[in-house]
């Protein structure tokens, strides 16, 4: 499962978890996995991944790259889902409950 959905999980992590914090002197405060959150296998159940057959005439033997593409797709999909559910556009990552509540003028 992981080898088929790893890029997708990375994209979800980038969208919902990953954030870099710096102090006023520019020192990275999130330089370990204690502060820099990423998802683990325990955060997700099974994800169904399907491949569509196609032919790319410029690729080797008709192949296409898929590794990097899947990282970019969760962010707009999740942002759209948040907007559909709440009416709030979150336009910077990560998308957090705090940002959604601020957009709803709750906090």
Model-inferred region functions:
Residues 3-107:
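C-terminal catalytic domains of large/alpha subunits in multi-subunit enzymes
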């Amino acid at each position: 499962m992981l080898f088929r959905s790893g890029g997708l999980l990375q994209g979800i992590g980038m969208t919902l978890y990953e954030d870099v914090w710096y102090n006023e002197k520019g020192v990275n405060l999130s330089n370990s996995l204690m502060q820099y959150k990423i998802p683990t296998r325990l955060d997700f159940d099974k994800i169904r991944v399907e491949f569509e057959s196609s032919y790319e005439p410029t690729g080797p033997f008709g192949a296409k790259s898929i590794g990097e593409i899947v990282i970019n797709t969760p962010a707009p999909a999740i942002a759209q889902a948040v907007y559909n559910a709440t009416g709030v556009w979150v336009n910077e990552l990560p998308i957090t409950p705090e940002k959604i509540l601020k957009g709803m003028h709750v906090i």
